[in-house]
A protein has these predicted regions:
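Class I (Rossmann-like) S-adenosyl-L-methionine-dependent methyltransferase catalytic domain
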Residues: 1-50, 59-107, 126-133, 147-212
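Structural signature of beta-strand start/N-cap positions in the alpha/beta core
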Residues: 52, 73, 113-115
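Class I SAM-dependent methyltransferase core
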Residues: 55
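Conserved acidic functional residues
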Residues: 64, 111, 121
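A short acidic, Gly/Pro-enriched loop at the edge of an enzyme's catalytic core
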Residues: 107-117
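A short SAM/SAH-binding and catalytic strip from SAM-dependent methyltransferases
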Residues: 116-129
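A short glycine-rich, Lys/Arg-flanked "PGG" loop and its adjoining helix->strand segment in the class I
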Residues: 132-144
Length: 213
């Protein structure tokens, strides 16, 4: 059987003890989560104000809080029930639907229903086969002309177990990710490496891919 995720990784993220500051600790390279949103994310998706947005793997809702203001309707979906529970506690009725999934599909989200699919700080840890399955599902749920904003790993040549690599990054290259997108009849709009500030050993490990159906 093909392995889609490591059960130990699932248990890791479903443990309340690792979320020391509800995930905001992972915004430290940008100063604050608000800085991360304003400097790395907002300009790329501001055109989707008042549109339908799906967020994959929201964690404890640190970016979700901003997406909920931007979107007319926001759906969040996560493998881990704890993440859905905490995001719901944080945002309540400001999110249209809170869904759990199997870690590779978007069951519960209708075909051709979303203007934007978004994910930050989650695909960086996903095995390539998980990413590939999600890209197939993103094609299914996006409206024609809709876009996806996916923050993913740019680390290639490490261990197949992402937890053995620096910062838990998965094996993935921009070319491999582009192949997944094009194989599903979508096109890459841009691929932008993230420059962490201050400069540190994480530079060159992540990229943001924006693609369109």
């Amino acid at each position: 059987m093909e392995k889609f995720y490591n059960i130990d990784e699932q248990k890791f993220w479903n443990n309340n003890d690792i979320w020391l500051d509800s995930g905001h600790e992972w915004s430290s390279s940008f100063g604050t989560t608000e800085n991360l949103w304003n400097k790395e994310i907002f300009d790329s998706i501001k055109e989707f104000r008042g549109k339908k947005i799906l967020e994959i793997a929201p964690g404890f809702g640190r970016i979700t809080q901003f997406l909920s203001i931007l979107a007319s309707e926001l759906i969040v979906i996560d493998l881990n029930p704890l993440c859905i529970e905490k995001t719901k506690e944080k945002l309540g009725h400001h999110v249209l639907a809170y869904l759990t999934n199997d870690g590779k599909t978007l069951t519960g989200v209708r075909d051709n229903s979303q203007d934007l699919v978004f994910s930050f700080d989650s695909f960086v840890h996903m095995h390539a086969n998980v990413t590939e399955e999600y890209v197939k599902e993103i094609f299914r749920v996006l409206k024609p002309g809709g876009q996806a904003f996916i923050h993913h790993s740019w680390l290639y040549g490490g261990s197949e177990n992402s937890f053995d690599n620096s910062a838990g990054r998965a094996n993935m290259s921009p070319e491999q990710f582009k192949g997944f997108v094009e194989n599903n009849n979508m096109r890459i709009v841009s691929q932008t490496p993230i420059q962490f500030k201050p400069l540190n050993s994480w530079n060159g490990m992540d990229t943001i891919s924006i693609f369109q159906k």
